[in-house]
Amino acid sequence: MYKVRIRGIFATALTKLALEWGFKIVQPTGKILQRFQIEADYSPPDLTVKDHESKTGVVVLGKCEAFESFLQRLGESLDPIVARARAGVKEVFSGKAVGEHEVEGPRGEVFKVPARYVLTPGGTGVFTVVKPPVGPVSGVAAPEIAVEGDYVELNTSGRVTFSEHIPQEDRLRLGILAETRLKQYASIGLRFKSSAKYADEEQIIKEAEVLYRELLQLSHGGPPGAVLRRGNCFAVVLFDRRSKEVLDSARASAVPTVRGHHALRAQGLGKCLDLLDYTGADVYEKAVEFLSRGPVLIYHVKPWGEVVKMKGEALGVKNGVLVVKRPLKPGGVLDGIGVRIERGFYALTCIPRDANYVVHTYYDGSNNVVGTYININTTPEWGRRVIYIDLLVDKTYAGGVEKVLDVDEFEKYKEYFPQRLRNPLQLAPSGRLECTAEGLVVR
């Protein structure tokens, strides 16, 4: 039975599902203990699941067997978008420098190296993955050795550090341990993981001894490109409306839950949403329309988890479409249209409630249309944060010419998407659409 620690806005729903799937919940919060009446087990997890920064998904990190089992169950139940990293977190490898700040690792993957390190091109050494590569986003590796256990990590940083989730009183206790019985390891580099706050001293000391012997062995290195120590598997898992409806249903089987709960939770409603859950008020459409007033922030979420944020001012809901005006910064070039952005340029963005696209029409300082960019995406969620997941393929209209963009990029990453989202052009609108202050029009 794999042990999983779950945190964040999806915690109740995912806990309900994980228990049904046969996982053991460890290090539960007080709310989870109360809601599910489960055993209070504070042993280290095999797997951690927590919010993605977009609040429209989670990151999954842990031992690879537990990771694969959990992702399989997620896929069967939620049909989400899943972007797996191409290297493990804290994977240790022998690499060859291909620049002062780049190293080639296993499978020819090139990692960025933090600026505080300067490499000699052509030189080899031992590196640890700090940030794994996902999608087109490069990974980051440091010319240090880190060996991670359940409670501590030994590394070659020369510092003693603590997980941000360890409170001050526990840091004092663990700090004393580092200065006394762990002194020989602390002088090399020691990081206390969050599970250390639940462990007794003997457990920590025993683990540190084992990790130290492994660190010494890893310091001998290996041939360039060799994986010397496997890291934890990592993935970004994103939920669209369909996935969130399943999560809403799972949560509702444990505690009172209104329709649209998880979409509303991403809006940061706090106690207001707790009140809606308690009363059972079915007001999702009205609530998000109310929240979509004044300043809004559009979260354009890439399938690998990268978030592009666009600020705008909502002009209102016009004919069932949320219209947002966005100023454009002069100097750049309109993507896919090729027109240079001049002073006074702006975009009107039309966001339908129930379609799989968002329409951006660009205007010059004299209010003339410059071109239109249609982004194909998951069904948008309205609110003060407008959230959707990019399906990578786009269409543009400019100067009487229609273009389809980024098909090659979609083909490269289409395995991230469930089958139902693997033909994005079928989800695109027909006709030539423009976004105006009064909503969408067909030209």
Curated annotation (Swiss-Prot):
What is known about what this protein does?
Probable RNase involved in rRNA stability through maturation and/or degradation of precursor rRNAs. Binds to RNA in loop regions with AU-rich sequences.
A single BP term in Gene Ontology: rRNA processing
Query: If you read the UniProt record, what top EC class would you report for this enzyme, in one word?
Result: hydrolase
Q: What protein is this chain from?
A: Probable ribonuclease FAU-1
Q: Looking at the keywords, is Repeat present? A: no
Alphabetical list of InterPro entries matching this protein:
DUF402, FomD-like_sf, Ntdp-like, RNA-bd_FAU-1
Q: Which family does it belong to?
A: Belongs to the FAU-1 family.
Which key words tag this protein in UniProt? Endonuclease, Hydrolase, Nuclease, RNA-binding, rRNA processing
